[in-house]
C-alpha cells in the first residue's frame, strides 16, 4: 500500500459524502472539505500507510469514521445553545496552525516550549476548535473560555494503567475521549502522581490520545521513556511532541533524553530548536 493507493481507497470509502478532495503530492496529504462552506480536514496519508501494515483495514475504518464525524460537525450551525461544560482545552504542537483556513485566529495560549493550549467546543464524537469569530456567538470572553476549559478538564476521569520496566513505573492515560493529552493541564492529578514517585517524574504527550507519566528510578528508565514517546509520536493521528517533560512542583521542563548508556539526560546544546523555543517561551511569559 502506498500513498496514492491509500488516497484512492479513502476517496472511494468517502464517496457518500458531499465533499471535494485536494491531494498534495509533495506533502503526501489529502484535504477533505465540504462543498457548501469549504470547511474540512487534512489527513497525512504517509502516517496512515505506515499503520496499515499492522492494522490493515481497521485503520481505514477508523479514518473513515473520524472523517464522517468531523465533516458532519462542520456544517454551519448556531453556537448559542452550547453550554459551558462543552468548552474543553486541547494540546497541540507549537507548530500547529495559528489561524483557520479562512484566516481567522484561533484562541490559544502558550504552554511549554513544545506545546500550546487550544480551546474547543465538545460536540460529542468530535470537537471544533474555537476561533475569534465564534466568541460573539458563544457569548464568552477569552478568559472565560480558559477558566471553563480548565474547570472541565479537572472533572474528567483520570483512570490509568501501569507497567513496570526494569524497576521503573510507567502510567498510561488512554481513555480515547479526545482529551487524554489535555490532562497534562490537571495539576492536581500530576501532583497526586508526583507524591507517589520515588524517582524523577517525567511526563509526555506524544499525541492527542495519550498521556504518559513515568517514575524514573534508574538510567534504563530514561531509555525506555525515550523509546515510548517516539513510538507513540509516530503512531498518533494528531502527533504533538516526541520530547518528555521533567515535572516538579507544578513546573514542566522539556528535556531531551540522549541515547542508551549516555550518562547525561539533559544537554542544552543537543538540539538548537529546543533551546531557541525555550528562550522565546521564557521571554514571552
UniProtKB/Swiss-Prot annotation:
Organism expressing this protein natively: Staphylococcus aureus (strain NCTC 8325 / PS 47)
Highest classification ranks of the organism: Bacteria, Bacillati, Bacillota, Bacilli, Bacillales
Family from the record: Belongs to the UPF0354 family.
UniProt name for this protein: UPF0354 protein SAOUHSC_01859
Pfam families: DUF1444
